[in-house]
Amino acid sequence: MDFEMEEESGKQQQLPRFLPHGSDIHSSDQHMIDLKVDKQKQMTEVEIDKQKPMTEVKMDKQKQTTKVEMDIRKQMAEVEMDDMDIGKSVQELTMEKEEIAAEEEDFSCYRRAWESRRGPEGCSFFEDTTQLSSMHFTHLTPKPSLDDAIVAETLQILSIKLTEIKGGFKLPLSVYGVVAARDSVDNNRNLLFAHSRIAPQRIRQHNPYLRLIGPSRAILCRDPVRFEIQLKVERGAVSRDRALISATRDFYVRHPGVHTICFENRFCKIELCVERLVETIQATICSVRVVKQGTRQRVESRCRVSCSTTSYSRKIIDGKPTYVANAPSGEVVLLDRLKKPMPSGSEGYLDLSRRVVSVEHEGSLKVVVQTCSSSGDIIAEGHVSLASEYFGFSQKRFNVDDAELEVTVAWSLLVVDKDDILRPVAV
């Protein structure tokens, strides 16, 4: 019995010797597990660190894209009231913006080039207009020397038409800006169209023509003629105005006749119609005056004034030299008030919007006056023809129904070069 107790006691005493050994095995396994967990944790952190920059870059790109889209949508919201950009994609809006910016930059480069070249030559500033008068030689008698005054080929400006509207614009449009020509006489602007923002021209479907105010003198076309066009659309607030077109174009043609010069971009197409005339002088329609009103017709209420030129060719008919009239030139509109009454206090003088035309030196000038009803229908017409002169004045009377009118025209040869007439005369 005692022996058994001692044996059991011995077993109990031996057990503690084995427990530490068993405890060491358990601690080693736990250590290995902890190492594996730490390693996996480190690998996971490395992977996260690697992926983090890529995620941040993607988020930055998304933010930038979102910002651009928000800016475009903001711009679209600003013009939504005018229905300008409804239905346009972000890409279309971006392309339109880039094209207008490119047009304006091209025009700015052209202007800087002109200023660097022409400024030192005495042409003064870019926006300066020609100061040469269309009546420069009108008062000189006898006929001036042909060294300073010439008969030469010129460009007749017939019309400027807004033939197409695109890019969300809709008629009617309030257009302002400048269309001008430059020739070799002085290289200054010869204004054809000029309207300020506070007094734009309303362009309508039934009358898409710009109301011309020039040229102020004949346009010489011995060398290329440069046309400049800068037009904008007035849309209420200044910040809402839109650029319509900015462009320049050189034009030169040897053959006489009517020619069309096109300007086109994403927003419009404009056609400038010109006619090249040979051996011309310049005529200034000084006045068209109502001398006596008729009982049936009052010319000043609503009327239209236009002119055309006719040249003559010398031909031998039946053995005799005979002058035969050629086909008349294109029509030049001097005043168009078909539906608007003339302002009061004009004392019978019709307020012409343009006055200078080119006439072939052996030709004639035909002036036509039409009176119209309130609906714009022509109800009466009268005309008068005047033979061209090298200098001086011509004056004739004619009738429109039972009203009597009088036209006065000044004639002048052309200036070939501004420097020639400014040169001191030797005594």
Where are these regions (language model features)?
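Peripheral membrane interaction modules
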Residues: 2-21, 35, 76-161, 165, ...
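Long, intrinsically disordered low-complexity tandem-repeat regions enriched in serine/threonine/proline
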Residues: 9, 14, 26, 31-94
